[in-house]
């Protein structure tokens, strides 16, 4: 099994696309990239800890490759927006691919270069690629949020879905 960590704005919106793929064992919401051990949601939202909201994915590389996960990541995000994603603004919502191995770093960097060269976006691809740091699980009520709170999830992801439809379909 391998581990991947992606930050793409609100973690509520990043779970379902990965969870629906064959070869995914788990997708958990949490916080990473900051300086405070085991932060709370309130602390991260206060924008003082340096953490991003992220998802940790445990996957079977025999069924789905890291490259496929990175490609799926791109189409869930606006890779030209370094200051948050869609409705969610601020450093804690910045887009980041966190790599856990040098091979993951190489795959992510090549994928980013390919996306930039594709001309799909007029602006530069600003998603950062950074080494993985400790991942702290978010509170239980955040786990599987789209299943537990479908109406609130739909409301909180409307602008994201519109962007994805217009730019990735």
UniProtKB/Swiss-Prot annotation:
Reaction it catalyzes: L-methionyl-[protein] + [thioredoxin]-disulfide + H2O = L-methionyl-(S)-S-oxide-[protein] + [thioredoxin]-dithiol; [thioredoxin]-disulfide + L-methionine + H2O = L-methionine (S)-S-oxide + [thioredoxin]-dithiol
GO molecular function per UniProt: L-methionine:thioredoxin-disulfide S-oxidoreductase activity; peptide-methionine (S)-S-oxide reductase activity
Domain of life of the organism encoding this protein: Bacteria
Keywords, comma-separated and alphabetical: Oxidoreductase
Active site, per annotation: 10
Signal peptide start and end residues: none
Enzyme kind, highest EC tier: oxidoreductase
UniProt-listed InterPro entries: Met_Sox_Rdtase_MsrA_dom, Met_Sox_Rdtase_MsrA_sf
Keyword Oxidoreductase assigned: yes
Record-annotated disulphide pairs: none
EC number of this enzyme: 1.8.4.11
Keyword Oxidoreductase tagged: yes
Pfam families found in the cross-reference section: PMSR
Function: Has an important function as a repair enzyme for proteins that have been inactivated by oxidation. Catalyzes the reversible oxidation-reduction of methionine sulfoxide in proteins to methionine.
Similarity comment: family membership: Belongs to the MsrA Met sulfoxide reductase family.
Protein name: Peptide methionine sulfoxide reductase MsrA
UniProt organism field: Streptococcus pyogenes serotype M3 (strain ATCC BAA-595 / MGAS315)
Gene from which the chain derives: msrA.2
């Amino acid at each position: 099994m391998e581990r991947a960590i992606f930050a793409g704005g609100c973690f509520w919106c990043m779970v379902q696309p990965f969870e629906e793929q064959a070869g995914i064992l788990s997708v958990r919401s949490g916080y990473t990239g900051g300086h405070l051990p085991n932060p709370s949601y309130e602390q991260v939202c206060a924008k003082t800890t340096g953490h991003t909201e992220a998802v940790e994915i445990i996957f079977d590389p025999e069924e789905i490759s890291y490259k496929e996960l990175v490609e799926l990541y791109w189409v869930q995000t606006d890779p030209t927006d370094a200051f948050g994603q869609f409705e969610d603004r601020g450093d804690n919502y910045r887009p980041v691919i966190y790599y856990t191995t040098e091979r993951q770093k190489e795959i992510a960097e090549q994928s980013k270069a390919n996306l930039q060269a594709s001309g799909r976006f007029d602006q530069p691809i600003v998603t950062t690629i950074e080494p993985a740091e400790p991942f702290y699980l978010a509170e239980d009520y955040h786990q599987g949020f789209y299943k537990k709170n479908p109406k609130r999830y739909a409301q909180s992801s409307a602008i994201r879905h519109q962007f994805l439809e217009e730019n990735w379909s």
